[in-house]
Amino acid sequence: MVELELSDGLAVVTIDRPQARNAIAPETMDQLEKALDAAEGARALVIRGAGDKAFVSGGDLKQLSAIRTLEAAEAMAWRMRGICDRLADFPAPVIAAMNGHAFGGGAEVAVAADIRVAADDIKIAFNQVALAIMPAWGGAERLGALVGRSRALLLAGSGTVLDAAEAERVGLVDRVLPRASFEEGWLALARSLANAPAGEIKRVLSGVAPAEAVNAFARLWVSDEHWAAADNVLSRPR
């Protein structure tokens, strides 16, 4: 249901429920938590859905239909909010590889990532209003940070469906790739981030004291990786 692949510092988490359009069920939450535990220490993480129809289609209504009390609804929302927070706070860069549509809660999972890469034929919508509910997994706040408060209210309040190009234009998606080269594209990006000090850059961008940023730079400066790269540059003919 949730698969984790670890290779050369890259963790790829795949929600593998294509028959349910990769919807989030209680067992999916269990396995996502375990996958994130196991991915600790990765230098980059990708979250994606199986197949090419859906990234994540939101909560699995069939399996969540038993939730009928206020307490149970709050518990479910807090749990998924916690999972999305773990994605957002992961110490290395997180990429949402949007291989298919992302609706409702799926859009919330996408905006929990640092970078969203989308196939050119996908659609994304914060369309919880169609079910007379609202984003509750932290997606409303993250949407506002990405596109601005007014546009976030417009998108989530109306449930507007955006295609990949529109999503990129408003800042909701960072890179759009042709469907034919999508898999190779997100994998190349993820590997480049895993092989760079992107985790330190993410930490500085998250807001640290100047002394911490300088210390992070200095640690990289004295690393073997830096001097191997520097020696390679210095040895080139001029």
Protein language model regions, located:
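Terminal low-complexity tails and localization/encapsulation signals of metabolic enzymes
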Residues: 230-238
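Conserved CoA-thioester-binding segment of acyl-CoA-metabolizing enzymes
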Residues: 1-48, 85
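CoA-thioester-processing core
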Residues: 83, 87-89, 97, 103-156, ...
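C-terminal long alpha-helix characteristic of the crotonase
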Residues: 117-122, 173-215, 224
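Well-ordered beta-strand positions
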Residues: 115, 154, 158-160, 166, ...
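Glycine- (often His-adjacent) and acidic-residue-rich active-site loop
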Residues: 41, 49-83, 102
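Residue-level detector of structured alpha->beta connecting loops
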Residues: 40-43, 91, 114
